[in-house]
Amino acid sequence: DKPNSRTYTIHGQADIVEALVEIKGLKSFHLLAHDYGDTVAQELLARQLEGAGAGTWLSCCFLNGGLFPETHRALLTQKLLLSPLGRYLNVLTGFAKFGRNFSSVFGLQTKPSNQELEDFWWLINFNDGKHVFHNAMTYIRDRLEHRERWVAAMQQSTIPVAVINGSVDPVSGAHMVARYKALNCRLDYLAELPLIGHYPQVEAPDEVRVHYENFLASLLTNSGEVSNG
């Protein structure tokens, strides 16, 4: 469902995830997140550390995403969607403009094919989803408002954390990883993919799979040192 009338908040999305965990009866599990999902995962991680989260996390892995508002380099389109012009921009945005914007955050050698762009466009438009984009952009404000809570959760995490990052992502690439390290956030496994952009799971799925499996395997050794992929 993609309701058009509601306000999309990160806390609301976190509530939905926890409701699903409860419905599925999940007791313990690993979490892998990307992009908007990274921010939802930050709120969920904070709840885990408070002892208020649903289920028990065994680990958390962040792919590319705006973990820190000060390093998130939003595209012009995202900024416009967040503005009062957002609802009108939704109407004007077609496949060609989407394709240009979407492709701009991929690596030079891993641009999406036209078929992949069509598939993503179909997913966006399913259930009239394109017309809620401006509502979903409020996550940018949420990141500013709750920065201290969410950054503290990563710094104080008692749960193993991995970062698998496409370095040439203009939105949240190598500069985000540098900030992550500078703030001494928990980091048990790091993989930096030098030619990959914002969507590593699409651009380099095999590399991401191998790194994620390596991270999970490293949890068994529990060496206490950062493992670099």
PLM features: what roles do these ranges have?
Residues G55-L58, G66-L67, T71-T93:
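A catalytic-pocket lid/entrance helix-loop region that shapes and gates access to the active site
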